[in-house]
C-alpha cells in the first residue's frame, strides 16, 4: 500500500473517531439538550436508551482512534467491525427514513445516515485493501 493511501485510510478513521466521540458524548450526557435544540424534546424517550446508544458511539469512537494510530494490517478485524457498524447505522437510518417514514428528525438519516454511508464506503475499501495485504503477509510467513 502506498504511503498516501495509508495516510488517507488513517484520516478516514481519525475523522470517524472524532465524529463518534463527539456524538457519543452529546448523546450520553447532553441528549435532553440535543433533542431540545432539534425541537424534538417530545421524542426523547427519557430513559437510559439514548445514553446507552451514546456510550456505544463513544466506545466505537475509541476503536476508530485505535485503528487510526495502530497497524492497519494487524487491526483488519477491528476495521471489519467498525465498517459493519457504519453499514448498520446508515442502512437502518435510511430505511426508516425512506421506507417506513418514521424518524424523530430528518437530521438522523439525512446527515448522520448519509455521513455514515460515506464512511462505510471508505472503510470497506480500506478493509478490502488491508485484507489483501494481510493475506499476502500470511502466505509469505508460511
Predicted segment positions?
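Core segments of alpha-helical transmembrane spans in multipass integral membrane proteins
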Residues: 18-27, 45-69, 81-91, 117
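Juxtamembrane helix-break-helix junctions at the cytosolic face
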Residues: 62-77, 97-100
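Cytosolic juxtamembrane helix and N-cap/initiation of the first transmembrane helix
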Residues: 1-19
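Membrane-water interface at the C-terminal end of transmembrane alpha helices
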Residues: 117-138, 142
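Non-cytosolic membrane-interface motifs at loop->transmembrane helix junctions
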Residues: 38-47, 76-79, 103-114
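Membrane-helix boundary connector in multi-pass membrane proteins
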Residues: 91-111, 128
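Short membrane-interface helical motifs at transmembrane helix boundaries
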Residues: 25-39
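Juxtamembrane "helix-exit" motif on the non-cytosolic side of transmembrane helices
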Residues: 32-36, 69, 94-102
Amino acid at each position: 500500500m502506498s504511503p498516501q493511501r495509508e495516510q488517507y485510510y488513517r484520516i478516514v478513521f481519525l475523522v470517524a473517531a472524532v465524529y463518534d466521540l463527539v456524538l457519543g458524548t452529546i448523546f450520553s450526557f447532553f441528549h435532553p439538550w440535543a433533542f431540545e435544540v432539534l425541537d424534538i424534546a417530545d421524542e426523547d424517550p427519557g430513559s437510559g436508551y439514548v445514553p446507552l446508544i451514546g456510550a456505544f458511539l463513544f466506545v466505537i469512537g475509541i476503536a476508530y482512534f485505535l485503528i487510526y494510530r495502530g497497524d492497519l494490517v494487524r487491526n483488519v478485524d477491528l476495521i471489519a467491525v467498525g465498517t459493519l457498524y457504519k453499514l448498520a447505522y446508515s442502512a437502518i437510518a435510511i430505511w426508516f427514513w425512506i421506507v417506513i417514514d418514521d424518524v424523530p428528525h430528518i437530521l438522523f438519516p439525512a446527515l448522520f445516515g448519509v455521513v455514515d454511508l460515506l464512511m462505510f464506503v471508505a472503510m470497506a475499501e480500506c478493509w478490502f485493501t488491508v485484507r489483501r495485504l494481510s493475506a499476502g503477509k500470511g502466505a509469505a510467513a508460511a
